Structures are given as C-alpha cells and as structure tokens.
Curated annotation (Swiss-Prot):
G protein-coupled receptor which associates with the patched protein (PTCH) to transduce hedgehog protein signaling. Binding of sonic hedgehog (SHH) to its receptor patched prevents inhibition of smoothened (SMO) by patched. When active, SMO binds to and sequesters protein kinase A catalytic subunit PRKACA at the cell membrane, preventing PRKACA-mediated phosphorylation of GLI transcription factors which releases the GLI proteins from PRKACA-mediated inhibition and allows for transcriptional activation of hedgehog pathway target genes. Homodimer. Its main location: membrane. This is Protein smoothened. Residues 35-151 form the FZ domain. It comes from Gallus gallus. Keywords: Cell membrane, Cell projection, Developmental protein, Disulfide bond, G-protein coupled receptor, Glycoprotein, Membrane, Receptor, Signal, Transducer, Transmembrane, Transmembrane helix. GO terms for biological process: central nervous system development; commissural neuron axon guidance; negative regulation of protein phosphorylation; pattern specification process; smoothened signaling pathway; tissue development. It is a multi-pass membrane protein. It is found in: Cell membrane; Cell projection, Cilium.
Length: 794
C-alpha cells in the first residue's frame, strides 16, 4: 500500500514536468525522425575539437569510418586541417561533432539537422574539390532530416580558423583565394622568394637609364624645336615621350612606401581584379600610365614607319605627302590606347605584381593579356615591319636606279639612313619577339604554376594536421616556379625599346645643337660657320627687296631663323636635288644683283598689280608682303589647268597660218622703265644669209603678220633675252630703219607685226592672256612676255 502510494505521488509529481516538453514545434520533426536506435556508450573524451560536450553518452553509429571513440577522435584531428580555411572551419565544427560524437540517450542517438549540413557546403567547397564528401557526411534526408534540433548546435567553439602562409586572413570576399574562404594570397608573390624580390627591384632600378636616354632625346628636340618640329622626325619626339612616361610609371614604386600602396590591398593581400570601390586608385593610376604610354608608343612606331615610307617615295619632288595627315596621326595614336584602357578598366582585369612593382593587365587571367597586349603588339609588328621594309627598298631603289642624279652628299646620307634603319628595325623587331617569347612562356606554364601553388597550400594544411596528431611534419615547397631570368628579359625588352628609340639623336648634329644652346644661354658667340641653303638665302633677299631698293649697296644679314641647321635626327632630312648646303662668298655677294635682275626691285613710282587700275601710294607698301602655302590640291589643279591650256594652244599649222594679230591696246598700268640695250655676245655676221631674220615670209607681204607672229620669239635677236646677235644692224637695216618708236618694246626689241594686215585688224586672238600676242613657245622670251603683259602678277 504505502509503496503504491509513493509511486503514484512520484508519477503525479513528475508528470506535469514532462508534459510541456512533449508538444513539438510546428517546424520540428517528430521525435522518431530525429532519433535513431543505437547502442550508447559513455564518453571517453569530454571535449570535441577543444570544446566541452554537455552530455555524457555518445555513439559511433553515425560515423561510418570509425568503429570506436578512439578512431572517431583520430578522424576529428584529421579534419582539423580545415583550420586553414577559417570560414569553413567555423561552420564545419558543429557538424563534425554532431556526427563523430553525437548525443546518445535511452538507446537513441540524435541526428543532425539538414540546416546544419547545408551550412557547410558553400564555405567548404575545397573539401568537395579536393577529397569529396564521404557518404555519411552527404546531406541526404535520411541522415540529416529537416527541422531536427541538435544539442551540439548550442555549443560555442572557442577555436577559430587561421590562414597559413602564403595565405593571410581577410574579410574581403574579393580577396579570397579560390575555395579557401576567409584567406587571400599575400601581397608578396609566393612564387618568388624574398631574395628574388630584392634582386628584381635592383634590376628595375636600371630603368633609370631609359629615363635618362629618353629625357635627353626630348630635351634635344626642345632645344632646337624650330628645326626639329618637322615630320617624320618629330614623331620620334612623341615615341620617346611615351617611353619616358611609361618608365616613370615603372620607377614610381621606389618612392617611400609606394610599392605596397600600388600592389597591395589594405588587408595585406595582392591586388587582383582592380579597380574596386573600397581601394585606393594608386594601382589604377600606375596601370594607366604604363599601359597607355606603351600602347601609344608602339602605335607611334607604326606612324613613324609610314611617314618614312611616304617621305622616301617623295624624295626629289616638291610634293609633301604628310601635309594634312599629321592630325590623323594624333587622332589614331591617342584614341586607340584610350579605348583599350577604358575597356580593361570596365572588365576589371588590372592585377598587381610585387615582382615588377606595377599593376598591369592579365597577371592572373592571361587571356586578357593576350587580347590587350600581344594582339596590338603583333599587329604593330606586321604593319610597321611592312612600311619599314618598303622604306628601305625605296631608298635602295633611288640609290641603285639613279646613281648619276645623286650628289655625293645625298648618296652618303642615303647609305647612312639605310644602315640606321636596318639597325633600328633589327633592334625593334628583336625586342618585340623577345616580348612575345616571354609572354608565351608565361601562358604555357601558368596552369602548372597554379597547380603547384595549390598543392603547396594543401601541404601547409597537412602540416597543421601533423602538428595536431604528433606525426612527422611534411616538407612543403612549390615545385614549379617561374624563372626570374625570363622576367628580367621581359623588362629588358621594354626598357631596351625605349633606349633604341632614343638612339636617333646620337649624332654629331645633336652636339652642335647643344653647343648653340649653351652659347645662347650663356650669351657667348658661336664662332662656327653657318650653313645657309641657297633657297632660303634667295627668299630672304626677296623679302628684303624694299630695303635693297632704298640702299642698293647694303649687305644682307641672315639671322638664325634663315640659317639651316640639321635637326637632331640627322640623315632623315636630306635633299637629293641640292648638291651642297655650303654657299660661296662670291655667290652670296651677288644675291642682291640677282634679285634686281629678276625684277624684284622696282622704282618707287612703279607698281605692278594684277588689276587694270593704278595702286594708290599708301597701299603700295602692302604689295611687297607675299605669304603663300600652296596645298597639294591647289598644285594639282594648277597642273591640270596648265595641261588644258597647252592642249588649246596646240593647233594645226593650217589654222595658224591664217591668223593675224590685232594691235596692242593701251593699258592704264604704268610700264616698267626702258632698260638699256646690252652688247651682243657674238661676232657680226659677214653675210646676210648668216642671220636668222628672214626679210619676207612665204605667202606674206612686207610687214605682214601671219605665221611670222607665232614664230618671231624664237628667232628675233632681242638684246636681253637673246644676246647672241649682231652688235649692229646690217646696211639694209640702216637704210630701212623699220618701225617707229611706237612699234618698239621697252627693251629695244621690235614689236611684230610692224603694222596691221591690209584689209582690217584681222582675227582677234583669244588664246593668250592678252589680245594681240601670238602664243609663247620659247622659254627664252618668258621675261619679255611677263614685262609686256599688264595683267601679270609678279
């Protein structure tokens, strides 16, 4: 009786406590689904992965690879290698303890929930990729039912993950190493040792040689910019400017703390996939400086070879092939690199490299480097090489096909230019091929390097496991690493290209430029004799014709703007038509007389103008200033006009024989003063038949025009234009003095015909510029025709 009453009281007392725990949550599974029958045994290890367990019994039923608690404990130590993946380690610890050391009570073992299993899939992708999940850890519904609470979920694990070198801990998802969430690659490239880094940085410091050479080239061009600013030589100025700026971007890393700022992120990881919103722009700025300058420089190289090719084809002519095209050079050269740079920044493929100390495209993804670096450089190699070879062939053709037309100086310059072009082309193509070879070396071996690095990271994880299990620690090393020598050769190709571009100013002309510059800066006089081109001296004399008119005895002084110096790029600016640039003193002293003889110096009261009205005195001063820049299009139209005029003048003799010439019409423009007659240069002919003046033409009477008018210029012995004439007339001429003064020209020559044809003034000629004159067929009388024509503009 009393025992029964005691049992009843105990049941009533315990009943209310257990009843509230019986109802399950709406999301929780029934108790029979969250448990499984198993043999419970007392825990031999009171902790799991360093954290104390809140229960005393467990079972090895859920861990298929363990038959005892000792085996389960050993397997947990093996799984501890995931400490090197911090985010994975944070979520996998509860799962491992719930499987290897689950709670077991009353012959029932608790099953972990589906949520606990799924939480480990994304952070622990390295397990799936490297080993694969074992079957008992796969998130199947029978092993991991939905909505089952687990006692292990309430445990707070004290051990947190860590990142073994060469990985560092970071909370930036963009810095995480693949499949290892929470860790990123350290800023210093792990494929190279610390010693190799220092050696490479010392090597990069030698890029200052490129900076010095290119800067010297730029300074040389600027010092003599007036003579150097000519295409195609000035293109070398832009090429050297591009390589100078690019070299500045490479050595910017040597400023205090600049290298880490350029190639490292704030969390100590390597910059990959720039630009990003939460990082500084130092990496992007260095990339733009280096890449944009490099691409602009190689495109300028194409423009240089094209300019050489077209300029060499136009040697010996007045045609300027580059006139009007230089603006397109700038448009193409500056716009294409800009588009490529913007495209790279848009796809965020700028990576930092601690070895080179710069940011560039495609250090991680080599496909972008092939598309944005090798493809443009390869195209430049093909196009530039074509124009360079054509230019050399053109020079060789000029030298071999026209040896008699070339002066000794021009031939020497052609030989020098061909030699320099050959050396320059060899260096340029050699450096480009070296660059291609280094990049292909990277492309073919990058996958192997990445695989070796991944194995090294896994080996470091095994070191952690060996430390936990007191097993021998394995030796970890990166088996396949890139060659430092190849990296040096690649940088040497870049710096060597810049140096080769600067060699074009390593000439004697550069020394003379700097000597003149030093004399100009210090105020000293330059005692070197000046070389003046005849064309520039004549142009200077014509421009000073007003001063020469006022003072005929004065001597011309030529300023430095008239003196023709060789530019720094000697050998490219040569004239195959001018035998020498030196001018003799006798020739220079007679320049003023030549200008006067050509009709450039006129009396003050005489004005020659293309209009038919006199020019007022106050406007005559402006008539002497003539500035013209004839474009190729205007020259082409002028040539077409001359050809059409020549075709019109070519008429048959039958039509020309019946023409007559109308008398000259008076002009309101003042005529030039009559020049004195000059003595003849031949002896007096002894016989009448020796002269070239026929008395009467066939079919015409005395004094008639006709065919004689068209041919008179080739035979009439004028005293100025044709001095090879008798010094005095024949006796017949003395008896018949000929036409009166009104029928004579200003130079003393007779005007033909002496009187109009009988029966009228004849047919008016309209082919020439003035009525009354026959077509001009002789260049010897061109001066006479110009002086006669009142409408001609001198």
């Amino acid at each position: 009786g009393p025992c029964w009453l005691w049992a009843l009281a105990l049941g009533l007392a315990l009943g209310p406590r257990r009843c509230p725990a019986a109802p399950l949550n709406a999301s929780a599974a029934p108790p029979e689904r969250c448990r499984r029958p198993a043999a419970c045994e007392r825990l031999r290890f009171g902790s799991c992965l360093g954290s104390a367990l809140p229960y005393a019994h467990t079972s090895t039923l859920l861990a298929a690879d363990s038959g005892s608690q000792e085996e389960a404990h050993g397997k947990l130590l093996l799984w501890s290698g995931l400490r090197n993946a911090p985010r994975c380690w944070d979520v996998i610890q509860p799962l491992l303890c719930a499987v290897y050391m689950p709670k077991c009570e009353d012959g029932q073992v608790e099953l972990p929930s589906q949520t606990l299993c799924q939480a480990t899939r994304a952070p622990c992708t390295i397990v799936e990729r490297e080993r694969g999940w074992p079957d008992f850890l796969k998130c199947t519904p029978d092993r991991f039912p939905e909505g089952c609470p687990n006692e292990v979920q309430n445990i707070k694990f004290n051990s947190s993950g860590q990142c073994e070198a060469p990985l560092v801990r970071t909370y930036n998802p963009k810095s995480w190493y693949e499949d290892v969430e929470g860790c990123g690659i350290q800023c210093q490239n792990p494929l190279f040792t610390e010693t190799e880094h220092r050696e490479m940085h010392v090597y990069i410091a030698f890029s200052s040689v490129t900076i010095s050479c290119t800067f010297f080239t730029l300074a040389t061009f600027v010092a003599d910019w007036r003579n150097s600013n000519r295409y195609p030589a000035v293109i070398l100025f832009y090429v050297n400017a591009c390589f100078f700026v690019g070299s500045i971007g490479c050595v910017a890393q040597f400023m205090d703390g600049a290298r880490d700022e350029i190639v490292c992120r704030a969390d100590g990881t390597m910059r990959l996939g720039e630009p990003t919103s939460n990082e500084t722009l130092s990496c992007v700025i260095i990339f733009v400086i280096v890449y944009y300058s490099l691409m602009s420089g190689v495109i300028w190289f194409v423009m240089l070879t094209y300019a050489w090719h077209t300029s060499f084809k136009a040697l010996g002519t007045t045609y300027q092939p580059l006139l009007g095209k230089t603006s397109y050079f700038h448009l193409i050269t500056w716009s294409i690199p800009f588009v490529l740079t913007v495209a790279i920044l848009a796809v965020a493929q700028v990576d930092g490299d601690s070895v080179s100390g710069i940011c560039f495209v495609g250090y991680k993804n080599y496909r972008y480097r092939a598309g944005f670096v090798l493809a443009p450089i390869g195209l430049v190699l093909i196009v530039g090489g074509y124009f360079l070879i054509r230019g050399v062939m053109t020079l060789f053709s000029i030298k071999s096909n026209h040896p008699g037309l070339l002066s000794e100086k021009a031939a020497s310059k052609i030989n020098e230019t061909m030699l320099r072009l050959g050396i320059f082309g060899f260096l340029a193509f050699g450096f480009v091929f070296i660059t291609f070879g280094c990049h292909f070396y990277d492309f073919f071996n990058q996958a192997e390097w990445e695989r070796s690095f991944r194995e090294y990271v896994l080996c470091e994880a095994n070191v952690t496991i060996a430390t936990q299990t007191n097993k021998p620690i394995p030796e970890c090393e990166i088996k396949n690493r890139p060659s430092l020598l190849v990296e040096k050769i690649n940088l040497f190709a870049m710096f060597g290209t810049g140096i080769s571009m600067s060699t074009w100013v390593w000439t004697k002309a550069t020394l003379l430029i700097w000597k003149r510059t030093w004399c100009r800066l210090t105020g000293q006089s330059d005692d070197q004799p000046k070389r003046i081109k005849k064309s520039k001296m004549i142009a200077k004399a014509f421009s000073k014709r007003k001063e020469l008119l006022r003072d005929p005895g004065r001597e011309l002084s030529f300023s430095m703007h008239t003196v023709s110096h060789d530019g720094p790029v000697a050998g490219l600016a040569f004239d195959i038509n001018e035998p020498s640039a030196d001018v003799s003193s006798a020739w220079a002293q007679h320049v003023t007389k030549m200008v006067a003889r050509r009709g450039a110096i006129l009396p003050q009261d005489v004005s020659v103008t293309p209009v038919a009205t006199p020019v007022p005195p106050e406007e005559r001063s402006n008539l002497w200033v003539v500035e013209a820049d004839v474009s190729p299009e205007l020259q082409k139209r002028s040539r077409k006009k001359k050809r059409r005029k020549k075709k019109k003048e070519e008429v048959c003799p039958e039509r020309r024989a019946g023409l007559s010439v109308a008398p000259l019409t008076p002009s309101s423009v003042p005529r030039l003063p009559r020049l004195p007659q000059q003595p003849c240069l031949v002896a007096i002919p002894r016989h009448r038949g020796d002269t070239f003046i026929p008395t009467v033409l066939p079919g015409l009477s005395n004094g008639a025009g006709g065919l004689w008018d068209g041919r008179r210029r080739a035979h009439v012995p004028h005293f100025i234009t044709n001095p090879f004439c008798p010094e005095s007339g024949s006796p017949e001429d003395e008896e018949n003095p000929g036409p009166s003064v009104g029928h004579r020209q200003h130079n003393g020559g007779r005007r033909w015909p002496p009187e109009p044809l009988p029966g009228g003034s004849g047919v008016t000629r309209t082919r020439g510029r003035r009525a009354g004159l026959a077509p001009i067929h002789s260049r010897t009388n061109l001066v006479n025709a110009e002086l006669l024509d009142a409408d001609l503009d001198f």
